[in-house]
Amino acid sequence: MEEQKIELKIINMADIQSQEIEWLWYPFIPYGKLTIIQGDQGDGKTTLVLNLAAKLSKGIGLDEDMQVSEPMNIIYQTAEDGLADTVKPRLEVADADCEKIMVIDESEKSLSMIDERLEQAIVQTNARLLILDPIQAYLGGGMDMNRANETRDMTKKLGLLAEKYKCAIILIGHMNKAAGNKAAYRGMGSIDFFAVARSVLLVGRIEGQKNTRAVVQIKNNLSAFGHSKAFELTEEGFHWLGDYEITADELLGGITPKANKKERAKQLIYELAETNSVVKSEDIVNLAEEKGISKRTLENAKKELGIKGKRIGESWYWKLDEIVKP
């Protein structure tokens, strides 16, 4: 069969208008790009994404780094859970505005990543976020996700759709069983899924903490890597913890992470409070850095403890006299 000839078209970079990357959640989820959230089955990927969607449906950020100005429309496609008995109850528990969360009806025909209904739905609903859960359910009949050429074409088309409408697209993927391999190669199927995504997040259980899950960025082509995050899953439900000290190697290898630096920062503050009612901000920051605690982690500990700043002369101080040590 003769290969179809394509007319040559040249793009001059002088004709391209420069644009800045827009972020749904900096530096984890960009608008107009593909993001993969992957992890082992049962480790909380879907729970994380449903709670993210619930917050966004009300114009609220899940994390303090998430700048959300208004409620947004979201398309959530799942091939693993029932809408009535699983998805809707979980959204209600997460206090979602279900008017803002929509699903493409697949009762007559299953959806695929290149289905024209995806574009139609984004246009019709003005969705800013599209979620496909899981990746392998939306390949289409006869498609082999382990064949690089097939997955590359499919994900490229999906990426162009995200770019065209400035819509963030999240693909949820299960990890394979290749323990010890790099996270990129443990993702289900072809490495091309990983290659096309601009950001990849790994969700997993933290060794020694049965209720805590970590979120670690293992790929970012658009900015510096983000700080690892964590959340808890208990009988009371989902609880976002924010910054957490753990690496991808620790998470994948089942290694107990070093003591949480935020807890170490709190302990440092408690110790200072025993002998000081106020301490110069600069002195606390320097002392923390000597102990391997970043300024950001220290500020998070300060916020959680409700510590207020006080200006004395030309310098800022932390008021430690009202801290109640647990």
Name each region found by the language model.
Residues 1-10, 123-126, 164-165, 207-326:
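C-terminal regions of RecA-like/P-loop NTPase motor modules
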Residues 2-4, 19-20, 24-26, 41-43, ...:
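Conserved inter-motif catalytic segment of the P-loop NTP-binding fold
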Residues 31-35, 72:
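Pre-Walker A (Motif I) flank of P-loop NTPase domains
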Residues 36-37, 42, 47, 69, ...:
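Phosphate-binding/switch region of NTP-binding enzymes
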Residues 48, 52:
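Hydrophobic positions on the alpha1 helix immediately C-terminal to the Walker A/P-loop
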Residues 57:
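Gly/Ala-rich phosphate-binding loop of Rossmann-like dinucleotide-binding domains
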Residues 100-102, 199, 308:
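Conserved beta-strand segments of alpha/beta enzyme cores
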